[in-house]
């Protein structure tokens, strides 16, 4: 719920959202200044996960599917099957061989290239590996922070770990 997310995001302080915005989903391709952006993704397992591909410029707008030097937000994909479907989408993105890649979440100054696809994929695989070894959410968080000490958005590691270990409901 919105209220639950506000409570979970309290650590954002002044950056905490102050209002709920109703969004209208994009259901097809988008044209901007004569350039067509293809709406891709959204497989049955992750029907709400899409990205935009602009073939002419070889540009990919990854949205919530891509992270660069941030802990990956996995709370919305609580099962191994969800995360496997995400990895499949990342493989689909990589196969396009994009030259410009814009992740939905990244630290300032990070590269705007396909390394975000590889980084997100590697993190998801590491998450599964550490999940199998961790006794609880706290130990999973510790393992993820240990593997990615310079990544931002630690709250993503904390909440994702709790959700994956069944200690917290999300969404």
Where in this protein do the model-derived segments appear?
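Short, charge-rich amphipathic segments
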Residues: 10-29, 52, 62-80, 155
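Metallo-beta-lactamase
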Residues: 1-118, 122-129
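Short flexible/disordered coil segments
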Residues: 16-22, 28, 53, 101-102, ...
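Accessory terminal helices/loops
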Residues: 1-11, 36, 95-100, 107-171
């Amino acid at each position: 719920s919105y209220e639950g997310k506000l409570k979970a995001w309290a650590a954002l302080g002044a950056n905490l959202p102050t209002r709920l915005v109703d969004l209208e989903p994009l259901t097809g391709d988008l044209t901007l200044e004569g350039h067509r952006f293809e709406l891709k993704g959204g497989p049955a397992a992750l029907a709400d996960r899409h990205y935009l591909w602009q073939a002419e410029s070889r540009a990919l707008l990854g949205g919530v599917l891509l992270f660069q030097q941030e802990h990956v937000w996995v709370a919305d994909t609580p099962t191994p099957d969800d995360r496997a479907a995400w990895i499949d989408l990342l493989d689909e993105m990589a196969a396009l061989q994009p030259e410009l890649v814009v992740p939905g979440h990244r630290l300032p100054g990070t590269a705007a290239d396909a390394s975000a696809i590889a980084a997100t994929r590697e993190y998801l695989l590491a998450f599964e590996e550490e999940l199998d070894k961790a006794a609880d959410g706290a130990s999973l968080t510790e393992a993820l922070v240990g593997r990615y000490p310079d990544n931002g958005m630690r709250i993503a590691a904390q909440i994702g770990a709790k959700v994956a270990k069944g200690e917290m409901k999300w969404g």
